[in-house]
């Protein structure tokens, strides 16, 4: 029988399956151009190994996966997933380009994300860290080792073992480390003081930390401690933070989102504590000591709000292509949904001459 904490952690880990199913859907429906060739590897790995994760059986894992991956996603969900993926990819690639590949990416709660593999195809020298719960990291590691293309991209000769039961899965190491790729099976809540837990981390190179709907599952205190951990480990060198997460806006739609999350056993404490861009900016500046903050919501990124300076996130030609894939009649509905998700960039550095100039390639609501 699972403890209350184990049950809660299982629910949080399950959100990675939600994200993967959304990525799978937009990939299948041709939103991604070029398509993501690695999504299927993560899906197949979950199909093999979810049954061995805490709280699952062969039957319950099969039901969970069938419900997520066989049901058609609504166009409004596909559009939001596309905008999220596209915007984050653009910032990450611009960061890598500006620092000419001599940089480091840290993806918190990376789970089934495939961004690292895409980046290695064109930026072989970037250092990439992925951190997630040990179980999630194991599923990802096994996906990597079962595909020779991904093995070559990350730089490992290790091959996949034979795992046929929970005991073998439980005893299997979640860690994978190469010269440029580091997969860490770590609960973020255990990162409290800078130490040797982050194998391969290089504090001397510019670093971008990504939290894509991850820190929002922590309490406000845990959120702040996690942010402070990374600013301390930066050792006064340049570190940028790219954060994507929901916010309540203290309105009726936000209340509906809260009830929906609670019905799934999820409690996003920062969702209402920092309900809008202004309160989040204050929290990140005053409690997390970030500077040069840029904040926007996904409605703005998607072009559902009027921009004054023309620095659009997605050009008209690309949006024209996307609009032809699936029709969305209720423009007000998607605008309202996207307003409740924010994208934030901030930086921590003691080096006054170093910053990420490319972040102003795009227009932001608040800076």
Swiss-Prot record:
Keywords, sorted A to Z: Methyltransferase, S-adenosyl-L-methionine, Transferase
Enzyme class: transferase
Sections of the chain in a coiled coil: none
Enzyme Commission (EC) number: 2.1.1.233
Pfam families listed in its UniProt record: LCM
Reaction(s) catalysed by this chain's protein: [phosphatase 2A protein]-C-terminal L-leucine + S-adenosyl-L-methionine = [phosphatase 2A protein]-C-terminal L-leucine methyl ester + S-adenosyl-L-homocysteine
Keyword Transferase set for record: yes
GO BP term, pick one: methylation
Gene Ontology molecular functions: protein C-terminal leucine carboxyl O-methyltransferase activity
Binding positions for S-adenosyl-L-methionine per the UniProt entry: 84, 109, 132, 187-188, 212
InterPro entries: LCMT1, Ppm1/Ppm2/Tcmp, SAM-dependent_MTases_sf
UniProt key word Hydrolase: no
Superkingdom per UniProt: Eukaryota
Task of the protein: Methylates the carboxyl group of the C-terminal leucine residue of protein phosphatase 2A catalytic subunits to form alpha-leucine ester residues.
Family: Belongs to the methyltransferase superfamily. LCMT family.
Identification of the protein by name: Leucine carboxyl methyltransferase 1
């Amino acid at each position: 029988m699972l403890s209350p904490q184990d049950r809660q952690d299982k629910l949080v880990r399950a959100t990675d399956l939600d994200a993967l199913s959304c990525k799978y859907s937009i990939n299948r429906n041709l939103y991604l151009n070029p398509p993501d060739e690695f999504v299927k590897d993560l899906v197949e790995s979950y199909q093999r190994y979810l049954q061995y994760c805490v709280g699952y059986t062969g039957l319950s894992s099969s039901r969970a996966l069938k419900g997520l991956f066989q049901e058609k996603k609504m166009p409004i969900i596909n559009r939001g997933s596309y905008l999220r993926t596209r915007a984050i990819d653009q910032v990450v690639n611009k960061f890598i380009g500006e620092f000419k590949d001599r940089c480091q990416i840290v993806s918190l709660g990376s789970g089934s994300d495939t961004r690292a593999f895409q980046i290695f195809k064109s930026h072989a020298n970037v250092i990439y860290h992925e951190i997630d719960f040990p179980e999630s990291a194991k599923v990802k590691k096994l996906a990597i080792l079962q595909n020779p293309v991904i093995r070559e991209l990350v730089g490992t000769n290790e091959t996949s073992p034979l795992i046929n039961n929970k005991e073998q899965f439980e005893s299997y190491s979640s860690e994978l480390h190469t010269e440029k790729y580091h997969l860490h099976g770590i609960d973020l809540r255990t990162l409290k003081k800078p130490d040797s837990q982050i194998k391969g981390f290089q504090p001397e190179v510019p670093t971008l930390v990504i939290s894509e709907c991850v820190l929002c599952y922590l309490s406000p205190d845990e959120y702040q401690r996690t942010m402070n951990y990374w600013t301390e480990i930066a050792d006064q060198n340049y570190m940028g933070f790219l954060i994507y997460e929901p916010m309540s806006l203290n309105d009726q739609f936000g209340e509906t989102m809260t009830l929906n999350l609670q019905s799934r056993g999820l409690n996003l404490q920062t969702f209402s504590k920092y309900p809008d861009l202004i309160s989040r900016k204050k929290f990140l500046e005053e409690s997390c000591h970030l500077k040069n903050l840029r904040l926007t919501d996904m409605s703005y990124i998607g072009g559902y709000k009027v921009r004054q300076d023309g620095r659009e996130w997605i050009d008209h030609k690309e949006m024209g292509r996307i609009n032809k894939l699936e029709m969305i009649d209720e423009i007000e509905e998607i605008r309202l949904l996207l307003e409740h998700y924010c994208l934030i960039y901030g930086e921590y550095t003691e080096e006054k001459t170093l910053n990420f100039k490319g972040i102003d390639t795009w227009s932001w609501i608040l800076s």
